[in-house]
Amino acid sequence: MTTPTLLRVGLDIGGTKTEAVALDPNGRLVGRLRMPTELGAERVLATAERAVRGLSFQTGRPLSAFASIGIGIPGAVDRETGEVRHAFNLDLAELQLGRLLSELVGVPVRVENDVTAAALGANHLLELDGTIAYLNLGTGLAAGIVVDGAPWRGAHGVAGEIGHLPIDPNGYACPCGQFGCLETVASGSAISRAWPHGGEHPAQDVVRAMEAGDVEAAAVVARLVQGAASCVRVLALSLDPQSIIIGGGLRLLGEPLIGGIRATLEQWAEQSSFLAALDLPRRVRVLPKHSSAAAVGAAIIGA
């Protein structure tokens, strides 16, 4: 009798939706589902359990066929215990997510920061080698770093927290307590502050206003582009990665952002032979629109 192939499960728990994937031992996607994330510690746990059981139903495999579960989630993550703290967009102050989910489904669980998980997933899905940096342009700003297929977190786990790199001491106050951090320029929260008369989706609204000829909107978008290009430059000069992958919700702005980043990098290269030699525009890649990078990366981490 042939022994059933064990699957690896990955969950990407975000503030609005949770995505779950199942990978076979060769890393191929054999199951995927999405569902709304319910907020609050107990409901986040319940969402995670429903996602795992949903994959079991979708793949026709019992929970015992799942070798491991990895979870990518925002907030402060203790990778040793699986505890999550301060995940504010999930209305979650503290949750022993790894232990409690493992008790509910009977499968080993590992928990990781969502940006690190997305970096690993992007590295796997795009079949990259060497050193890669994943730039997450979302509500906040952070980067994940992968070296030879493994996450690099630094001595204290803060490698990649470039959102809290100050670039203007006279700039806006940052939630971290500093002033003028990159996150106050290149993030969804920065756009919301700079374009307060936007609707439910300020980033999309400000781009539409810019395209309609609004001068103020054009200045907001230009500041976002300059900040995002600065992030690429920081990652290139500090890590010298082969590729810099742009992910996060803001990437969906498309050409106004991505084309603007590349144009800015090219402009800087014209002004600096040093930057020109680094060929930064060529290193920039964009995560595809419907990519499951964070969930796939979580599955890899869980193994």
What are these regions (language model features)?
Residues G15, A117, T139:
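Short, glycine/acidic-enriched loop or turn micro-motifs at the edges of active sites
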Residues R110, T116:
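Glycine/small-residue-rich loop that forms an oxyanion/phosphate-binding "nest" at active or ligand-binding sites
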Residues G130-V185:
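Glycine-rich phosphate-binding loop of actin/hexokinase-like ATP-binding domains
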Residues P36-L39, L92, V158-E161:
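A short acidic/small-residue loop/turn micro-motif
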